[in-house]
Amino acid sequence: RNLGLNEAQGKYINFLDSDDYISSNTFRDVYNFFEKHYSEIDVVSIPIYYFGSQKGNHPLNFKFKKTGVADLSKQPEFIQLSGPSSFFKAEAIGDIKFNVKLQTAEDAFFVNQLLLNKLKLGLVKSGSYFYRKFEAKNSLLDYSSKTKGYYISRIKQFHFKLIYCSKKKYGEVLKFIQYVLMYDLQWLFKIKKIDHILSHDEIHELYINLIFILQNIDDDVIYNQKNIQNQLKTHIFFLKYLGNDYLANCDYKYRKQVYEEIIDKLSLNQVFIDIFEIQNDVIYVSGFITTFFNKKGNVFVFVNDKIFETKELEYPQRDRFSLNFEYAFNNDFELYIPITSKNIKIQFKTEVNDFKDLEIKFTRPCRLSNTSKYLLSKNHIAKVKGSTITVKPK
């Protein structure tokens, strides 16, 4: 790409990847948009659509509700990381080059160095970039996540340098840069095990670097991430505020202080139901709660205010790890409830949250759900609302 930049003579530049293609109208529409907004913008973005083994929209396509110029100081969540789905004003590139020390994220670094100049991003809704998804996990991204560079040089050459560029130009890490950093970090945090790639000392260095980056990202940016589960966000907040003390299994009371500040915002007071069935006047319930302080979190079920103890189940595949750190514990349970009265009210509680009612959520296998709130059996109907399941005769 750097060689191509040296040879390019056009007014606008794009870096189309060899496995992908662009719709025929895109070049005309992008050219016309650039000509109309030439002095405002240096970068124009178009939507990404997947084809091949996966079809659908790229997660960042939400910003293409209409064609126009996005002010990144007012819409910092309208981030751009893809180079191939971007078009660049040639004269604005100047001495900016792709960082050859990066195997991945070189696009994102290049794009956002340019965006830091004007803080504006052109959006052309009518354009289309078609990105090929492969059946086998043989992409550069899949390969690179199995190399040391993905965790060491990528952090230093992309995240650190992007922080430096923003601070040098504006004296702070601008909000849209924070969104870029956090969006990119989510893929890192979702990796469970890395001890087969990094040594103990390298993992320690990685966490020191991650803590530094997180401390340059505002809380609302973390909260607003759409593709990170709330349990993992909790771990990220612990890392940000407790740092190495958290990794060293710091005192319960310090973790609890952070936890209590985020518990309502992240809706952590929840029980997840896998199975809810009614057969022969007996209700069978199977589910789990997630705890962050200790491995054991007993679940108690209140049936018409009478306490039922649950039986503990073990599903090791549900263990929650991020980058070799076990950050949360799934406590799986089951119980049988005999139907001995006409109207039954079922609630779930745990001592972990001082016996407050747990909001009820459902996993995919469950016939009840948060959208389908009714379950019919031969003789009964079950209804869920908030923290209560009610079972009545039909």
Regions found by a protein language model. Give the residues of each.
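Nucleotide-sugar donor-binding/catalytic module of glycosyltransferases
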Residues: 1-160
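Non-catalytic N-terminal targeting/anchoring module and adjacent flexible stem/linker
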Residues: 32, 171-172, 176-394
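Noncatalytic linker/hinge segments flanking ATPase motor cores
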Residues: 81, 86, 164-172, 226-228
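Catalytic core of nucleotide-sugar-dependent glycosyltransferases
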Residues: 131-135, 141-171, 193-220
